[in-house]
């Protein structure tokens, strides 16, 4: 039902606001700490606090627009494609599939739109599908910390 509700919001501005709330809810479930800038002139929608005085800016985008077997997601503001250092990540919500792409800024910089293919293996942006670890500052496939405990084992005869 949630997918249909978001897609049913025809006003792009309202759908964008709804997507920002969806991002905040999901980010909190992922254990991320969020802050929101005051006003709408920042060039990004939310801030993820990574701790240790490190924060990253996130621009939230959403799409319902089919493009073949995927979706086209606009990557621009009212002035054109996003410029360098506007934010660190784009969180792109593919509403009909209920999935997120967490895209580093350099992958979308200067582009008018990107094609997102959640069901296609080896797609251009496939490595960023549900890549919430990037917002935490973790590298995919890298174990940041391991904790273990062991006891001596003496088999009974």
Residue ranges and their predicted role:
Residues 1-42, 47-157:
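Mixed-charge (Asp/Glu-Lys/Arg
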